[in-house]
A protein has these predicted regions:
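Flexible domain-boundary/linker segments
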Residues: 20, 48, 56, 79, ...
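Internal, glycine-rich beta/alpha segment that forms the wall or movable "lid"
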Residues: 82-187
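Short coil/turn segments at secondary-structure junctions
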Residues: 11-15, 77, 116, 120
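Alpha-helix N-cap and loop-to-helix initiation/capping positions
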Residues: 16-23, 50-54, 81, 85, ...
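Short, flexible coil/linker segments at or flanking structured domains
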Residues: 24-27, 57-59, 68, 74, ...
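N-terminal beta1-alpha1-beta2 module of alpha/beta enzyme domains
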Residues: 1-71, 178-179
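Active-site beta-loop-alpha junctions enriched in small/polar residues
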Residues: 8-10, 44, 76-78, 106-110, ...
Length: 187
């Protein structure tokens, strides 16, 4: 049997942020020492109770101190990000962790976050997240020339490339073709 730790993480709103982050780090290091197989870290922008707005950045601080545990985003709220940037950051983290990433993505469930990022309704956020995920997978599996013309995202990478010099190639994850992906659904 494998054990995992899912933490958003939640703290009392009055707890100082540096203290909350230190406690979260301690919990994950302990989970690694106890043999937990994975840890899931949430992402929220507008709450003092769940103060991790950048889970990949937070998890990167633990790579050496928690050398065995797999790190999972629980979740990256894709409608609040540019999926090209997320694809590059995910690939970089997966490389730094030697393939210990599980990518959790979702539409965003905290209503104050949704308001901050344009107050789109859940069905539209689902469509944005799924299109963004499709785009990320395309970026991980292909090199220029690339074109995407979707409902929410429109880009090309074909005119200003120099593939023989590596210009026009996006970062690829350590795990091929890409890290395991988990989709969060909110009802």
């Amino acid at each position: 049997m494998e054990l995992g730790l899912f933490t958003q993480p939640v703290h009392r709103p009055e707890k100082p942020w540096d203290q909350a982050l230190a406690e979260d780090r301690e919990a994950i290091i302990l989970a690694d020492q106890l043999g937990f197989s994975e840890v899931w870290i949430g992402e929220h922008f507008t709450t003092k109770a769940e103060q991790i707005p950048a889970p990949l950045m937070f998890m990167a601080t633990l790579l050496k101190e928690a050398p065995s545990i797999r790190f999972a985003t629980g979740v990256i709220n894709l409608p609040y990000h540019n999926p090209v940037v997320v694809a590059a950051e995910v690939a970089q983290f997966d490389q730094l962790s030697d393939g210990r990433l599980i990518l959790g993505i979702g539409p965003g469930g905290l209503m104050s976050d949704a308001e901050l990022f344009g107050d789109k309704e859940m069905p539209e956020r689902y469509r944005i997240a799924l299109e963004g995920l499709d785009l990320m997978i395309k970026l991980w599996q292909e090199d220029a020339p690339l074109n995407h013309h979707g409902e929410f995202y429109d880009f090309s990478l074909e005119k200003r490339v120099w593939l023989s010099h590596g210009v026009g190639s996006m970062a690829k994850p350590f795990q091929q073709p890409y890290p395991p992906i988990a989709l969060a659904m909110v009802g």
